[in-house]
A protein has these predicted regions:
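N-terminal pre-core extensions flanking Radical SAM catalytic domains
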Residues: 47-53, 226-230
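A short, Lys/Arg-enriched amphipathic alpha-helix followed by its capping loop at the start of a domain
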Residues: 20-31
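Glycine-rich beta-alpha loop elements in corrinoid/cobalamin-binding modules
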Residues: 32, 38-40, 55-172
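Radical SAM [4Fe-4S] cluster-binding motif and immediate context
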Residues: 173, 183-261
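Generic structural signal for well-ordered alpha-helices
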Residues: 21, 66, 88-92, 215, ...
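A short, glycine/small-residue-rich beta-strand->loop->alpha-helix junction that serves as a flexible
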Residues: 8-16, 80-85, 213
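Conserved SAM/AdoMet-binding glycine-rich loop
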Residues: 1-10, 32, 75, 105, ...
């Protein structure tokens, strides 16, 4: 069984996405990561120089090429924010049209904040932290067992929506066991116009991060604040314990940096 994880957003930083890909790759080796950046320039400084620019750059031919590649997988898992949800919906529909047997999951910020909107398009959405819940889903999915009771997931079963409750948030001890994020691996692909999905290169990373030869990571999860512009409001609404900071040990993050070096 082949799995494609797909990130639809500006650039290829995608820290949460990278964490998920590393974890899934560790339990299911036949997994690839596909990045679909939405602008020609991935540099985050663009947001200072050209604020509000999120124009889609892909032609219908590009979208069909993207869908054709993804439709070869048995399981396709999208991740996107709300700003890129319309494009994600369009790609999901094209993948389904190309291969109706491909099972599609949508995770990331948009399905968490707007689950009622997101569930209309894929077979399932992830509405909370994905590491443990996806492992539970995948175990049942691969065995041919019923997976529709998996917590942190909603399912669209031919128009019948199944809404499951949330799992407890990951503890610091559980986070300690997660693999490090994936960078520059041979299973990472980036979509480029007129070329299709090609392996990521050093230049792709440097232009994406925009600040030279840097390494981005994230150590802690959780926040006590409710800023109006942030999705943290929804996280706290779903589980009040999201206000608490959680993180693996200092040794964990030191080991992560050493591995990169």
């Amino acid at each position: 069984m082949n799995i494609s994880f797909v990130c639809v957003e500006d650039g290829i930083t995608a820290l949460g996405f990278r964490k998920m890909v590393s974890l899934v790759k560790s339990i299911h080796p036949s997994t690839e990561a596909c990045y679909i950046p939405l602008t020609n320039q991935y540099n985050p400084l663009r947001f200072l120089l050209k604020p509000g620019e999120h124009d889609r750059i892909y032609s219908d031919a590009d979208l069909n090429s993207i869908a054709s590649h993804l439709a070869k997988s048995d399981l396709v898992c999208f991740s996107s924010m709300t700003a890129y949800s319309d494009l994600t919906k369009e790609i999901i529909q094209l993948v389904k049209k190309t291969n109706p047997k491909t099972y599609i999951i949508w995770g990331g910020i948009h399905p968490i904040v707007h689950p009622e909107d997101a569930i209309e398009y894929p077979d399932a959405i992830c509405t909370g932290e994905g590491e443990t819940s996806f492992k539970l889903f995948l175990s049942s999915f691969k065995k041919g067992e019923d997976y529709t009771s998996t917590k942190n997931f909603w399912f669209n079963n031919n128009g019948k929506i199944i809404k499951n409750d949330f799992l407890p948030l990951h503890t610091s001890e559980e986070m300690e066991k997660f693999p490090f994020m994936s960078y520059a691996e041979d299973y990472e692909l980036i979509y480029k116009q007129d070329k299709g999905f090609v392996p990521t290169t050093t230049n792709d990373y440097l232009s994406s991060f925009g600040l030279g030869n840097t390494y981005d990571t994230i150590w802690s999860i959780g926040c006590p604040y409710k800023c109006t512009y942030c999705a943290n409001n929804k996280f706290i609404e779903n589980d009040k314990d999201y206000r608490k900071l959680r993180h693996p040990s200092v040794d964990y993050v030191i080991a992560e940096v050493k591995e990169v070096l």
